[in-house]
Amino acid sequence: MNNNEYSIRNIDGKYYLYCGDAQVLTPEEAPICTTSEELAKLLLRDAEEYGVDTENVLSTLSYHSLYCDLLHQEEDEEGENIEMFNNLIHIDYFWAFYEPRTIRAAALSQYLDVLPKHVNDLPLHQNAAYVNLMAATGSIILPHKLVCMLLSETSRFSIENYDELVLALESYGQASGAAEDIDVDWTFDSIKKMVKTFITYYMLESL
């Protein structure tokens, strides 16, 4: 298994999150989640501790069935899709607490301040400041994660957004040294596949 690949393993009736062959959550670090509801409670607990809007994670989890439908929708059906993607983006705030390759705890407050500003308010090519923050703290954000965050700023999967997405990812690659990881096929079907992969990292049920 690739060292950057995540999987959820059922061991003796309990779910464990793995990054490659390494266990990410251990019983000593956090409660073991046996259901998606327990996962939600775990995320909400830390959301409250760090002052993050808990409605975001609730919306994300409640949209689970709609995400499944989204994977089969076409490009021109943009209204609800964007609302769903915006809710999907928020889950990344909470994942920073568990993902060992993302921002370290010492920079959490700065991360929570900078992420919304650079993902939602600035043109995609100006995400370099956000990328530089990630690189400066020794963190790595996987390309497909960044894609999903950037999609919150795009109104639809269209050719107008294509160049900006690639440019932002190139900036990410240069800053993090992960340029070799971003050579992917930027078609609508390919992006949908990445989104499906992204979702499975946060949901215990298989899509």
Could you describe each region identified by the protein language model?
Residues 2-23, 29-31, 35-207:
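Non-transmembrane, aqueous-exposed alpha-helical and coiled segments at domain scale
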